[in-house]
Amino acid sequence: MSTMPVSLMDIVVNGYGASLRKKGNRFVLDHGGEVQEFSADMVRQFILSDSVSITSGAMKLAAEKGIDIVVLSRSGMPVCRVYPCEPCGTVTTRKNQLAAASTAAGYLLSAAMVSAKVTNMANLLAALGKSRNNHDLRSAAEEIGRLADAIPPEGTPSMQGALIRGIEGRASRVYFAALSLVIPPDLYRGRRSQHPAEDVFNAYLNYCYGILYNEVEKACILAGLDPYIGFLHAERYGKRSFVYDVIEQFRQPVVDRMVITLAVRGRMQREDTDERWYLVGEGRRKAIASTLQRLDEERVIGGRTTSFRSAILENARSIVNYLNEGAVFEPFVYRWG
């Protein structure tokens, strides 16, 4: 069994055969006689992977304490989560979210989030180009910046949705091609590959995006948003399409910069994946620990000291204010020094 109390609040259980049960106000992890206990007052979230069993008593205690329990697939995506039955937010929020999905209000929100993603890609490449004095990286950043400027300022999801998805796609192709100037070729083939990945770098991206998705989904639920009512990714029927909308703002600041650092500093190896390019063992542990650390590290964002985890929740709450009160929505744009 491998358990990692990454912080006082996040407990990662990564091992076959582990069990989680309740003992008074404590959680007990047991694997083959190796026992660890955690006070329920000190836990924010349990992240479970592989085959882990959990008792109903442990789930009830977690619900009473507002503790999130999420189960990850081998690709890092959450496949289920346990949270209290009491609904978060109001009916008004979800009604307004559903109404906005087909109106100009929904388009403005989704366009702002795509613009933030494209701008973040440009900003990251510009920072990499500056630190490496690389003209090609800076040129790619400028090309992506021009694509961000091409996003129409007005429209509806049905009228302009395909256009801004196309802009996002072109920007992504330029961005991931440019990363081949930074990532060693034995780790990265110069293009984005998802499920399955085609190389170690994409395997890390996939898994870490899954952990980020978990955090964004949780923020949407806490803010009272419906994860299934999406604007830009509305075509993903049966999927949590709104989570895919919101996450776009955070991919480069939270995950990409971190995974690039792992690659260029020699902390990423072929042995971190299996023959089908899924992270295993030490690779999975590095991905989880690095992403959670990245989420919790304090940094200056928007002129004040906070964390990416807090910024994600604040972003979800600002979406609620936009939908319910018509407040100005400022998407999450990150600038590297």
Residue map of PLM features:
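Active-site helix-to-loop segments that bind/position phosphate- or nucleotide-bearing substrates
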Residues: M1-K23, D30, E37, V79, ...
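Extracellular/luminal Protease-associated
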Residues: A40-I54
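Short hydrophobic alpha-helical runs that function as membrane-insertion/retention elements
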Residues: F46-S49, I67-S73
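Short gly/pro/ser/thr-enriched loop/turn and capping motifs at secondary-structure boundaries
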Residues: T55, S75-R81
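A short alpha->loop->secondary-structure connector
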Residues: E64-V70, M77, E86-T90
